[in-house]
Swiss-Prot record:
Family label: Belongs to the MEMO1 family.
CDD domains assigned to the protein according to its UniProt record, in alphabetical order: MEMO_like (cd07361)
Pfam families, per the entry: Memo (PF01875)
Protein name per UniProt: MEMO1 family protein M1425_2054
PANTHER family: PROTEIN MEMO1
Amino acid sequence: MKRLPAVAGSFYESDPKKLKMQIEWSFRHNIGPRDIPKQTYEKKKRDNLFFVVPHAGYIYSGPVAAHSYYYLVSEGRPDVVIILGPNHTGLGSYVSAWPKGEWETPLGSVKIDEEILMQLVKESEVIDLDEKSHLYEHSIEVQLPFLQYFFDDDFKIVPIVIMMQTPEIAEFLADAIYNVMQKNPDKDIVVLASSDMNHYDPHEITVKKDEEAIEKIQQLDYKGLYEVVEGKDVTLCGYGPIMVNLILAKKFGKKAYILKHATSGDTSGPKDSVVGYLAARFGS
């Protein structure tokens, strides 16, 4: 079963050569890390297990996303990348995993880790196996070319989209991921929370709203983050995935490190109506 790209040619370049250049542009951008990371091939225990990465068009959020990937790549190739994204389309189940096969992008195909996926399904009791949720959803797809640029097809993924973004669902998912990671100590597993920040306010308002959410992220306060999003009109689209990583970070004794916060006004556009983007890592 192959999932074909839904947003190649719109969110990112559909030509492989141009796509690689777009990824390099993201790393070298003055909002980005300004350098392309060197991948280590020495296998050692990974420190940064969990990340927040944005998922907009690369011309807008690519330079911010590059900060998270800089740290991920610098610690070497993971065996499995669990990618949690919000469900923008409203299709499918409350929590949906692509069941098997592979995902294709202009840079090639990446296989699903069906063994880890089925362990998560068994542990969580909230994950449905459902392709419909993923067919047109971009939040996971846009992460793959960044990973493929460095690791080719030498890693596997577990793609999960979350429509029901509540603290209770986040707790179920975090517990399941924690248990699976504990049961597979020989597998190098990282978890990406794919999310943009506040949407379509002027730059100054978006920065202020985002800062309220970022404060809760720094505190690993997942319920506080939920309250900010729900109670203060902070239109952060992937708060469910971020809540999962906040819970996981606390379980693993990790701290939050904000790598970069910017808006589309900083990267590629006018500042009267912007989207906020955050790169964060959770490590020692």
